[in-house]
Amino acid sequence: MPFSIILFSILLPIFAVAAAPLPLMPMPKQIEMGTGTLTLNSEVKIAVHGFGSQRKAFQLARVAQYFERIAGKPIALRVVEGEKADLTIRVKQAETQLSMPQLGMPEDYTLNIDKNGITLLATSVFGAQHGISSILQLATGDPLKPLSFPYTSISDAPRFTWRGLLIDSVRHFMPIATIKRQLDGMAAAKLNVLHWHLTDDQGWRIESKVFPKLTKMASDGLYYRQSEVKEVIEYASLLGIRVVPEFGMPGHASAIAVAYPKLMAKVKSYEMERHWGVFKPLLNIANPEVYVFIDNLLAEMVSLFPDSYLHIGGDEVEPAHWLENSEIQAMMLQHQLKNGHDLQNYFNIRVQKLIAKYQRTMMGWDEIFHPALPKDILVQSWRGHDSLNTVAKAGYAGILSTGFYIDQPQYSSFHYRNDPLPEKPQINLTQPRVMSLAFTVPRLKGSAIEGELVVLGEQVLIKLNSNLHQLVKTDKPITRETLQFIATMDSWMGPLQFEFNRTINSGAIMIGNSRYPLTIASISNPAPVNVSASLSRDNHALILGGEATIWSEMVTEHNLDVRIWPRLFVIAERLWSAQSFTDSDAMYLRLEHISDFSHRVIGLKHKVQQRLGFNSLISTTLGESERIKTLELLTHIAQIVEPSHYYTRHHIKFLQDEYHQIAPLNRFVDYLGVESRQVRELDQLVTRYVAGDVAALVQIEKQLQHWQMKLQDASLLRHSPELTEVHATALKVLQLIELSQHVLEECKGALQPSQTSNLNQQLLALQSLTDEIVITGIYPMRTLYLHCQSVNKH
């Protein structure tokens, strides 16, 4: 008998993932699994009803290509009308000509696979295409077997209507073929918005026939012709993906300054900006010619981009040039404008009216939000849930990007927890204040992070910078007498783990895999505890979804896929699937399959780019056998280490004077995946052992022995000059393995006191904050050591 798995309940989703052998991502809203399998031969009969001719031809070609890649042999699709089909697709709202996807379009579908074939029903062609994506993920095959599909019934629709990816084509230019490949992946992940970042300080990447100097003077010849833009938009629409352009204003405008300096608040000759960061050039918002420029630019761009939303950026405005400009000073007096924020709002109000003239809705980052603007603007939040909630409470729509910045290496489990509408924990603010601490976390670049910790009864809350207080988890109950403890929370920086040591008024914080020092100070006048209030049901409806972002300071076309895939599927699932899906272990199991599927079937290049990148570092003077062995060695090392998380690599580059457009991004670390499966498994084993599973110690030892065996040829790396850094890392991994043997001896009670005294410091000494490559295995082994040391002391 088939059994039903309905993902509306609180308890069932975890069991659903565990029980279901379906490697789907995102997971559907409802699944009913049967007990049989449908097999199809090398000719698949297909009937398609409701697709326009262009979309039908496009999708048939894709399905045939993907089926062949799955099967590993030729598969012929034969379109049938009157006879029985193996695969039937029916759309209720039939398409007569190519439909352009828009916000709020129906994306639901139902899918049934049984002995009679595959039946896909959808309200729109866009929902039908999501159903096709599910069919492809369900299919299995090889050259010696027929295509197979498990008997399954699915009823599916997205949780959020805005599910996007921002691609930054400015800081490093991305060719059209690269953009199209990401669209292929987005369609497979059921994402529906490409947010195309086309202008910034470092360049103007889209052809303007009205203002030709923009690309002539400020693109280095790297820009998209209008014909190419139309090609991308059509390709995206055939995949059910909207294309929302971003034209940054009034800041991030150095490229405009190079081409048209008279439009700037400070009129002078400008050179191309090559560095990364926030810069001062701003449009002169008191100059009428600026609004003529914007109006004419909008008229040209809306003729290219059919979507109803247009993004103006609006972030990181440094007002110095405005406040120094006499025309703007006079305007401030005339309109009673007090500061840079008032000036930006004055500009935004005028620009919003221009955008509305072209039947478009203005969109921008947090900084555009102001109650004087019409309610139909859309705010994209990089500042976090507190900012997004403020927007929604004021009656404005918003989407979340904080926590989805995939240009920053972060763990997929962190992205998976990052819900645009998180459930609010119960916090009792009437509990007595037990303790308050202030702490400071210095960063490698920029101002330090200032924080406060407060203990209210049994609750522990942390406040970071100007954000609201947030409930955190601790490793033990905290009292006034507690001198050492650990606290964990998620933040805009990533997952945080604090180690507080009140005995020495210092500690450390892990931001992802990067360990920063912190100092503790007493606090006589702590900030009032202020937590985020719950949103009303009406406010909930204003949170439209979210967007992942791939800013390209540290990314080129040669490693873009390594950074995006496969983890974008995790964010896609968070935006599509039920909120109750929170089992990260089950997610990682499916992600392994999806990584292979997206490489082998969809054609994403995360595996290819890594292999090519590693190959490029191997000396050409080596013989073929040595080159093969070196590549294998690099592949093994890549499974053990990670790039430093958060913005740590960016800040290291800044310290090295390599934080600019000319700096090469072709080292080993540039081709590393963002997280190590083997280290995650090691961490799980340590967690099991600490929880009482003594058998896990044997598996930990086997894992370490496996690493040691794989690194026995580490000396090969010395023969390739580009791998000097990797050789040093490999030697440190071997040191870790040696120290880990002492940790295991400590856990077995066989380590002498003389050997254990400095083991904690020795483990930590293997890693420096200024290392771009992180030997992440240090930290679970340190956790194991501290646990065993504590047990032995007692």
Regions found by a protein language model. Give the residues of each.
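Bacterial N-terminal signal peptides
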Residues: 4-14
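Contiguous, structured surface segment used for ligand recognition
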Residues: 19-160, 571-584, 589-602
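Substrate-binding groove of N-acetylhexosamine-processing glycoside hydrolases
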Residues: 24-26, 32-34, 40-42, 82, ...
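Generic beta-strand/beta-sheet core signal
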Residues: 49, 168, 196-199, 244-252, ...
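Flexible loop/turn segments at secondary-structure boundaries
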Residues: 54-56, 173-175, 201-205, 250-256, ...
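Feature activates predominantly on carbohydrate-active enzymes
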Residues: 98-311, 325, 350, 354, ...
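N-terminal leader/propeptide and maturation segments of large enzyme subunits in energy/redox metabolism
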Residues: 313-337
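Central antiparallel beta-sheet cores of small beta-barrel/beta-sandwich binding domains
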Residues: 435-524
